[in-house]
Amino acid sequence: MEYVTLISNRIRELCKQRGNISFYKLSEMSGVSTSALENIIKGHTKNPGIATIHQLALGFNMTIAEFCDFDEMNMYEFVEEENEVAG
């Protein structure tokens, strides 16, 4: 599973857990633009930045550590692309 899919699934899960919060409402709560949030959810943004993750976590009234603390993320292996290493 790709990193962006993990983040997207986590956002969907937290929205559902908190009473089916819409992405529009999450955008208002977090300060992340609706378009940026939709790009993450749809997988167009492959690597959301830490500032964006932080804003989303705050929107859910949690820390970054809490936002990222779920089984799939804890087992995820980050592997650098070959072209990134060579660059």
Which residues make up each language-model segment?
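Recognition helix of helix-turn-helix/homeodomain-like DNA-binding domains
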Residues: 31-47
